[in-house]
Swiss-Prot record:
Family per similarity comment: Belongs to the universal ribosomal protein uL5 family.
Subcellular location as annotated: Mitochondrion
Protein known as: Large ribosomal subunit protein uL5m
Any one GO biological process: mitochondrial translation
An example Gene Ontology molecular-function term: RNA binding
Keywords carried by this UniProt record: Mitochondrion, Ribonucleoprotein, Ribosomal protein, Transit peptide
InterPro entries in the record: Ribosomal_uL5 (IPR002132), Ribosomal_uL5_C (IPR031309), Ribosomal_uL5_dom_sf (IPR022803), Ribosomal_uL5_N (IPR031310)
Alphabetized SUPFAM superfamilies for the sequence: RL5-like
Gene Ontology terms: cellular component: cytosolic large ribosomal subunit; mitochondrial large ribosomal subunit; mitochondrion
A Pfam family hit: Ribosomal_L5_C
Source organism per UniProt: Schizosaccharomyces pombe (strain 972 / ATCC 24843) (Fission yeast)
Length: 287
């Protein structure tokens, strides 16, 4: 009898300690999954390509492939097997310690630039993401200055911006670590093409002083960056009608276009189909 009572007591304690899931608590009233059309979180997927994305795919990329064609290069041999994997200088000499020794590092500990590949239909350039960021100097004194900037970024991008905090203490700039100093938004997919189309077709043509991007823009890895003054923000159609309702002035911002191309010249050539470059850009075109 004692053994039976002990087993019953153990089973009762186990049932009391058993965790009850949310599904069991809600029962039939649990929320619908996001893929269910009756759910409040259901969002239908894209039914067509973005206009700018379709233009790049159908018109620009064939032109890029034709303009970058090189008849003196065999694309069949331009594979990873024929590229030089280890481009760091090796130790040369009769010293036995040179054998199996790690290669020498680049001077200044600079990283190696990616190997440029010949353009073919499989590695045509494309835009991976667009990062829009800004730093508000007035936010160092008054943090509420960032509220107007956050609302403006959310209006022109359609996404919730991310607050950027200072990493180091810089006394001449009155900068303290952990203080919010700016905001940024990372755009991908349809929102990225929508932002680029509005910027290139509606905003930049209204700037009388804008003649094009700098011919030297680029970080040698296929990324194009440029800055825009504070006069650009009120030109966006999302802000133009309600600009006077913003309590604080809106700053300028930086745009970083990240492409999958490893050649900066090819990246400039591709981005020039959206935003023009200034005259004298001899390296911006592939020839």
């Amino acid at each position: 009898m004692l053994g039976i009572r002990k087993n019953i007591r153990i089973s009762v304690n186990f049932l009391q300690r058993r965790t009850i899931t949310v599904k069991q608590k809600l029962g039939k009233n649990r929320p619908l999954p996001g893929w269910d059309p009756n759910s409040e979180y259901f969002r239908p997927g894209p039914t067509m390509l973005n206009r700018l994305q379709e233009h790049l795919h159908d018109t620009i990329l064939p032109d890029v492939l034709a303009a970058s064609y090189r008849h003196d290069i065999d694309t069949a041999l331009s594979t990873d097997e024929h590229t030089q994997k280890d481009r760091l200088p090796r130790w040369i000499g009769d010293n036995p310690y040179y054998k199996n020794r790690p290669p020498q590092k680049m001077r200044g500990n600079k990283p190696l630039l990616p190997v440029k590949e010949s353009v073919n239909p499989k590695n045509l350039p494309s835009i991976s993401k667009v990062v829009v960021s800004t730093m508000h100097k007035e936010a160092l004194v008054d943090k509420t200055q960032l509220l107007s900037t956050m609302m403006a970024f959310r209006s022109i991008t359609g996404l919730q911006p991310e607050i950027v905090y200072a990493r180091k203490d810089v006394s001449p700039w009155k900068l303290r670590s952990g203080v919010p100093v700016g905001v940024k938004v990372t755009l991908t997919g349809e929102s990225m093409y929508t932002f680029l189309s509005i910027l290139s077709e509606l905003v930049l043509p209204q700037l009388h002083d804008f003649k094009g991007l700098s011919p030297t823009s680029g970080d040698q890895t296929g990324n194009i960056s440029f800055g825009l003054p504070s006069e650009v923000m009120p030109l966006f159609p999302q802000i133009e009608a309600v600009y006077e309702m913003y309590p604080h002035s809106l700053p300028g911002f930086n745009v970083n276009i990240t492409t999958n191309s490893k050649d900066t010249r090819l990246a400039r050539f591709f981005v020039s189909s959206l935003i023009p470059f200034t005259d004298g850009n001899k390296e911006g075109y592939v020839g």
